[in-house]
A protein has these predicted regions:
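Polysaccharide-binding surfaces and accessory modules of carbohydrate-active proteins
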Residues: 1-54, 58-170
Length: 170
């Protein structure tokens, strides 16, 4: 819950990255005007929607939901061209661009349902100390070679991650 609250306080450091035209962005900094926030509470969740405007032509909607009883949160980013002209290309979208600094990190998961010879659904656990690790599917089928569900554990903690998007992910 504390980490979610910290994320929501500083949009310029929000862990998403993307390009608009030739310009790379990490978070929603000075080129993004915050248009407003809404908060919706239910018995089990708290959803904050933040709307931004980029150069009068692209609206970005960031929907973040906290599930406090499960110590979990999620977010989705939407880009909409609201101008009268074509917008610059939006590319290289990383929906979660996060750097972990932790002692003895291990990544666990299972191989997906294709690709590796006769190894579908095989569990793996690897020490990722000192690695820059990029995992992606290779075809457009979300579960090809690796399932997009991971357990990350380190000395004193851990987390589950899921890439909730069909098709290409990285």
């Amino acid at each position: 819950v504390r980490q979610f609250r910290t994320l929501m306080k500083s949009m310029s450091k929000f862990p998403v990255s993307f390009r608009v035209g030739d310009t790379a962005y990490n978070g929603f900094g000075r080129d993004f005007t915050e248009l407003g926030r809404t908060l919706e509470n239910t018995d089990t969740s708290e959803t904050t929607t933040v709307r931004f405007l980029y150069k009068d032509s692209i609206e970005i909607k960031l929907i973040c939901t906290l599930y406090p009883y499960h110590a979990a949160y999620e977010w989705t980013v939407y880009f909409t061209n609201i101008g009268n002209e074509n917008s610059p290309a939006i590319s290289e979208i990383n929906g979660c661009n996060y750097t972990l600094t932790a002692a003895n990190p291990h990544l666990s998961g299972i191989l997906g349902d294709g690709g590796y010879d006769n190894q579908a659904n095989t569990p793996y656990d690897m020490n990722i100390s000192g690695m820059e690790l990029v995992i992606n599917n290779e075809t457009g089928r979300a579960t090809y070679n690796r399932f997009p569900y991971f357990k990350l554990k380190w000395n004193g903690g851990g987390a589950f991650f899921a890439v909730g998007w069909p098709g290409q992910w990285r």
